[in-house]
Amino acid sequence: MPEFLEKLAQLRQVTAHPEVCNWNEIYSIYGALAPDVRKLNTPDTITDGIDPRRIEACWPEIRQIVRSVPSYEACLAAMRQAGCKTTIQEVGKDPDFVRVSFRFHPYMRRRLSLKRVSHMLELPADLF
C-alpha cells in the first residue's frame, strides 16, 4: 500500500467535514482539461452526499480495509521484481509535478477514493 495509506490507517480516529474545494485553483491546475474536470464535478461532486459523521463512525472499518492491502514494502518489492520504475527520478518527473499531481488527481475522475475522502478530513500536516 502507498505510504500515504499506511499513515492514514494509523489514525485511530478522524474529524471529518464537508469537502471544501477551491475550484478556481483546481481548474487552473488542469489547464486545457479544466472543462472536462468541471463536467465531472458539476452540478454536484462525488462527495456531496457523504455525511462527514458517517466517515467518522465508519473509520474503524475503513482502517481495517486499508490494512488489508499489501504493505508499501511488499508492493515496492513486487514492482521491482517486475522491472517497474519505482522512483520519481526513474519515471523522469519533476518532484514538484508529482506533489501537485498527488494533491489534485482525485478531481479528474468521478470516483470516490480514499484520497478524495481524505480531503474531507482534518489531517496532521506531516501526513503528506
Please provide the spans of the model-predicted regions:
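C-terminal charged capping/lid subdomain of soluble metabolic enzymes
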Residues: E3-F128
